[in-house]
């Protein structure tokens, strides 16, 4: 019984941490980066509450950089 409770507690803590991480990623600014590649991506615009397309240069980005609109919406719940 104690083991089951402990496992449930660990799972809940893990999901809470993952949710917090995802939320903070969505608040990061759009970073195009200094490189000159041309990668169409999406970022979550926290001011509009929407996933917005942008061109990523290929280096020095952050977590708010999604390959698809679906991925952006799934993580940031837009």
Swiss-Prot record:
Subcellular location: Secreted; Nematocyst
A cellular-component GO term for this protein: extracellular space
SUPFAM superfamilies: BPTI-like
Signal peptide limits: 1-22
SMART domains xrefs: KU (SM00131)
Domain annotation BPTI/Kunitz inhibitor: ranges: 26-76
Alphabetical list of InterPro entries matching this protein: Kunitz_BPTI, Kunitz_BPTI_sf, Prtase_inh_Kunz-CS, TFPI/VKTCI-like
Site for Reactive bond for trypsin, residues: 36-37
Chief localization: secreted
Superkingdom of this protein's organism: Eukaryota
Family membership: Belongs to the venom Kunitz-type family. Sea anemone type 2 potassium channel toxin subfamily.
Function: Serine protease inhibitor that specifically inhibits trypsin (Ki=73.8-78 nM) and chymotrypsin (Ki=993 nM). In vitro, it shows cytoprotective activity in the oxidative stress agent 6-hydroxydopamine (6-OHDA)-induced neurotoxicity model. In this model, it decreases reactive oxygen species (ROS) level, and increases cell viability in a correlated manner. It is possible that the observed effect is due to the ability of this peptides to act as free-radical scavenger.
The protein's name in its UniProt record: PI-stichotoxin-Hcr2e
Organism: Radianthus crispa (Leathery sea anemone)
Organism lineage: Eukaryota, Metazoa, Cnidaria, Anthozoa, Hexacorallia
